[in-house]
Regions:
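Positively charged n-region of N-terminal signal peptides that target proteins for export
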Residues: 1-4
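Bacterial N-terminal signal peptides
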Residues: 10-22
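Sec/Tat signal peptide C-region and signal peptidase I cleavage site
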Residues: 24-30
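Early exported N-terminus immediately downstream of N-terminal targeting peptides
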Residues: 32-111
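A mature extracytoplasmic/lumenal domain signature
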Residues: 103, 129, 143-146, 156-158, ...
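Surface-exposed, charged secondary-structure patches
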Residues: 108-154, 201-208
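Short beta-strand edge/turn micro-motifs at domain boundaries
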Residues: 151-180
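Non-transmembrane domains of secretory- and envelope-associated proteins
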Residues: 171-208
Length: 208
C-alpha cells in the first residue's frame, strides 16, 4: 500500500501491549471494543476486502467500493463545514449543499487514488479511547502496521458516533490542513470557486 494520506500508516513498537483488533492479520487476544473504537474497527473491516484487491482495481472501481464505508463512517456534512471554516456562514443554502457534495466526492476519490497496492499491511485499533478536551467527542487511536514493522499513528475524532476529523501521525489535523488550502481558493473564487476546484480535482483523481 503506497502513497497513503487521508487514512494512513503505522509500525510496530508495543503493538502486543495494545488490546486491539488487527485487520489483515491473525487476531490478537483483545479486549472487546465498544462505542467509538468499535465504530472505527467496523470501518476498517469494511475497507479491507477492497484494500486487499487494490492493485487489481482501477481508481474508479476502488472509489465505488470505498464510498459506502467512508460515507457511513464519516460525518461528511460536519467535516465540510469545518474544512471551510468561517466563510461557510456566507454561503447560500444551495452553495452549502453543492460544497458538501463536491467535498464528499473528493474525499472518497482522494482515498481511492492513494490506496493503490497491498502487501500485507494490517490495521490496529486501540479499544481505549481518549475524551476530547472539548466538544464531547472521543479520540480513537489506530495504527496501520507494515510488514517491515513501520508504524504511523492515525487518530480519529469521533462525535455522535461518526468521524469528524483525522489526525495523521497522531497530531496533524486533516481538516486544519484542508482549511488552510481552501482559504485561498475561497478568497479568490468564493463558494463557486471551491466547488469548481473540488470537482476538477475529483475528476482528475478518478481519471488516473
Amino acid at each position: 500500500m503506497r502513497n497513503l494520506n487521508f487514512v494512513t500508516i503505522l509500525a510496530a513498537t508495543g503493538i502486543a501491549a495494545l488490546s486491539a483488533l488487527v485487520l489483515g492479520a491473525p487476531p490478537l487476544q483483545a479486549q472487546e471494543s465498544t462505542g467509538a473504537a468499535a465504530h472505527i474497527e467496523n470501518y476498517y473491516r469494511e475497507l479491507m476486502p477492497t484494500i486487499r484487491q487494490a492493485g487489481r482495481l482501477s481508481v474508479r472501481e476502488r472509489d465505488k467500493r470505498f464510498a459506502p464505508a467512508i460515507t457511513a463512517a464519516f460525518d461528511l456534512a460536519t467535516m465540510t463545514r469545518l474544512a471551510v471554516g468561517p466563510p461557510w456562514r456566507s454561503f447560500s443554502p444551495a452553495q452549502q449543499a453543492a460544497v458538501r457534495e463536491a467535498f464528499s466526492r473528493f474525499i472518497v476519490a482522494d482515498y481511492a487514488s492513494q490506496i493503490n497496492d497491498y502487501s500485507g499491511e494490517s490495521f490496529v485499533v486501540d479499544p481505549q479511547t481518549i475524551p476530547e478536551a472539548r466538544g464531547g467527542g472521543e479520540i480513537v487511536k489506530t495504527k496501520l502496521v507494515q510488514p517491515s514493522g513501520r508504524i504511523v499513528n492515525i487518530n480519529y475524532l469521533v462525535r455522535g458516533g461518526r468521524v469528524v476529523d483525522v489526525y495523521l501521525n497522531g497530531t496533524i489535523s486533516d481538516l486544519a490542513t484542508r482549511r488552510d488550502e481552501f482559504a485561498s481558493i475561497i478568497a479568490s473564487g468564493g463558494a463557486d470557486g471551491l466547488i469548481k476546484r473540488l470537482q476538477e480535482r475529483s475528476q482528475g483523481l478518478l481519471d488516473r
